Amino acid sequence: MKVLEDLYYSKDHVWVKVEGDKAYIGITDYAQDSLGDAEYIELPEVGTEFTAGDVLGVIESAKAASDVYIPVDGEVIEVNNAVAEDPSLVNSDPYGSWLVAVRLKDKAQVEKLMKAEEYKKFLET
């Protein structure tokens, strides 16, 4: 499984990339592999506010429908419509195909997520 060094990871197999007070959020290589070929992705609207642990959206595949849990508090400021229109992008490029960008409410929450090495160890358990 591919794990990128410059991202943060949740136990729900969601990655977070921080740029200032903005965070891009997507699913990991492990998550997309477990789900199989994504057929439909439901994403929130810009302006929606979330608390860490809330369901951010849903990814449906031939295997299953899976909720995507947001690991940080924030307000959606961008939605990746390309992924909604072509869900297979999360399979072919899970780390390049972010789902949403949020304005972080508490940057300290990001530091509580796993870094790449911790996430790799988590995957081994």
Curated annotation (Swiss-Prot):
Cofactor(s) needed for function: (R)-lipoate
Keywords, in A-Z order: Lipoyl
Short name of one Pfam family: GCV_H
InterPro entries per the UniProt record, alphabetical: 2-oxoA_DH_lipoyl-BS, Biotin_lipoyl, GCV_H, GCV_H/Fam206, GCV_H_sub, Single_hybrid_motif
Lipoyl-binding domain boundaries: 22-103
GO annotation, biological process: glycine decarboxylation via glycine cleavage system
Transmembrane stretches, start-end: none
UniProt modified residues of type N6-lipoyllysine: 63
Keyword Coiled coil: no
One cellular component term from this protein's GO annotations in UniProt: cytoplasm
Cofactor: binding details: Binds 1 lipoyl cofactor covalently.
UniProt-listed CDD domains: GCS_H
Cross-referenced PROSITE patterns: BIOTINYL_LIPOYL, LIPOYL
Superkingdom of the source species: Bacteria
Gene3D superfamilies attached to this UniProt entry: 2.40.50.100
Stored PANTHER family: GLYCINE CLEAVAGE SYSTEM H PROTEIN, GLYCINE CLEAVAGE SYSTEM H PROTEIN-RELATED
Family note: Belongs to the GcvH family.
NCBIfam families in alphabetical order: gcvH (TIGR00527), PRK01202.1 (NF002270)
Task of the protein: The glycine cleavage system catalyzes the degradation of glycine. The H protein shuttles the methylamine group of glycine from the P protein to the T protein.
Record protein name field: Glycine cleavage system H protein 1
Organism for this UniProt entry: Caldanaerobacter subterraneus subsp. tengcongensis (strain DSM 15242 / JCM 11007 / NBRC 100824 / MB4)
Lineage: Bacteria, Bacillati, Bacillota, Clostridia, Thermoanaerobacterales
